[in-house]
Amino acid sequence: ERNLTLAMMSMSCVTASILGAYIEMMPGQYILTAVPINIINALIATSMLNPVSISAEEDTIEKVGATDNGKKEPFFSFLGDSILGAGKLILIIVANVVAFVALAALIDKVLALFWKPLSLESILGVIMFPFSWLLGLPVNQAWDLAQNMGMKLVTNEFVVMGKVTADIAHYPEHLKAVLTVFVTSFANFGTLGMIIGAFKGLANKEDNDYIASNIGYLLLSGILVSLLSAAFVGLFVW
């Protein structure tokens, strides 16, 4: 359950190394505001969706680098093991991301057989419309925001940012704020692949299977945190 909590919180994180790229494409003040708010809302959302109780016996601190006889592992041995482990982990993560993105593309192709405009993005956009409207937007703006939300969930935040970056300066301030805050997270199908891949390389099979069986909670947590953060910031920007 604790591993599932970590996985759920990972859906709402961003790495500091790419904040500069975000700020180049979107209003920087909302990007920087979204990061700490996402952290707080991730704690709230995971506590509601996956409450965990830990006994005093389980609440321990693990020592790293020590062996049973009290001697530490040689540095270069530790370095070699770390490089090997990281290499395997990267390959597992890349393979899982490719598989998840390919699965989303396959679903789009199958849906297009029934009706050309039908896609996973458009379906998620329709599902997200009531929530975007509840953020206090007019219907036409709420619809556009919902479509961007659907696109972000299927692809990633960079696709949406690249789409709107040329015009976002002309958006109403409220729409600009809620859109920027919503897309400032890793909540998408590709991240699901990263998380599953990471836990395959780090956790045992039982823990990994438990996380994989609750993958819906991961996506729900990411969406809920993004909506909570967008709603909170939107309250103060009109």
Q: What residues fall within each predicted segment?
A:
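C-terminal transmembrane helix pair
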Residues: R2-T5, L153-W238
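Juxtamembrane loop-helix boundary motifs flanking transmembrane segments in multi-pass membrane proteins
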Residues: T67-S82, S119, H170, H174, ...
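Transmembrane helix-loop junctions in multipass membrane proteins, especially transporters and channels
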Residues: M25, N50-S55, I83, L113, ...
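Membrane-core helix-loop-helix motifs of multi-pass transport proteins
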Residues: E1-L49, E206-L228
